Amino acid sequence: KCDILIGLSGCALLSAKKAKSRYHALFFCDRGCRHILSQDDILNSIPSARQVYRKDIKIELEQYGMADYIILPSLHTKESFIQEGEKVEKLFVNPYGVNLEMFHPLPLESDGYDIIFVGNWSLQKGVDILVDACLKSGLSLLHVGAIVDFAFPEQNDRFHHIDPVNQPELIHFYSKAKILCLPSRQDGFGLVLFQAMVCGLPLVYSHYTGGPDLKKLVDDHEFLFEMPEYTVDSLSDTLLKALKKAEQQPRNSIRNYLTPNAVSNISWQAYGQRYNEFLLKIATEK
């Protein structure tokens, strides 16, 4: 018997139909990013970016319609569903977490870069304006991840690229940078925000990431910097503010601005607890 089926969006259509017809189960559609139509609009505005597959749109929309609840990782993803006409009562936001055994506070290496960007080097993640902002302000950048749909400026010695590494190896690279930047045009959350924050790096991010959610989970917001506008100038100014804050961190010692309460709020255990409480509440009402 199945009381509740949790299925990833785009992957659970047939399972959801069977669970609802055979067991009268509730279907929770777990969507890791913005509404598919919003995501499609964003990518359509960047012709050279990887686009949404047309067949995926139909499947996603059918799942949204079937779902009793839609599980989302961030406030901006919730906003996108509301903008597409979804009922607020159907949406549950549960921010992701971080492996606290894998990531922990670190000192900054003496020859560190100004900025680290971790993840796919893609237009969807805003790397084009990140490059322009770095060039404008003369900042150095370390990238760890795959090159996707935007050329990496390898001819400039201020930029350094590392191919994708296994997640446990990332902590080594976080020690090489003063701040992390994630200027995505749309990113469901961006787990690298959690990772870098736990390692002690100030964060710069766009509204279209999980950055705004972090302000609800941690006590000290002084090291969290959201771009006021999605422009090169705004990003450049925000990067400089974050770097100024990074200069105030202790030299040659551990960087750590999170309280024990904040650390507990951003763990995977906390994510599971929030999810479990929601499931129990719904199961009781069913």
What are these regions (language model features)?
Residues 25-58:
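Acceptor-binding helix/loop patch of EC 2.4 sugar-transfer enzymes
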Residues 64, 172-177:
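Short alpha-helical donor nucleotide-sugar binding micro-motif in glycosyltransferases
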Residues 76, 97:
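Carbohydrate-associated surface elements
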Residues 107-125, 131-136:
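Conserved donor-binding/catalytic core segment of Leloir-type glycosyltransferases
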Residues 150-171:
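Nucleotide-activated donor-binding/catalytic signature segment of Leloir-type glycosyltransferases, i.e.
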Residues 185:
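Aromatic "clamp/platform" in nucleotide-sugar-dependent glycosyltransferases that forms part
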Residues 202-207:
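Short hydrophobic beta-strand element within catalytic cores of glycosyltransferases
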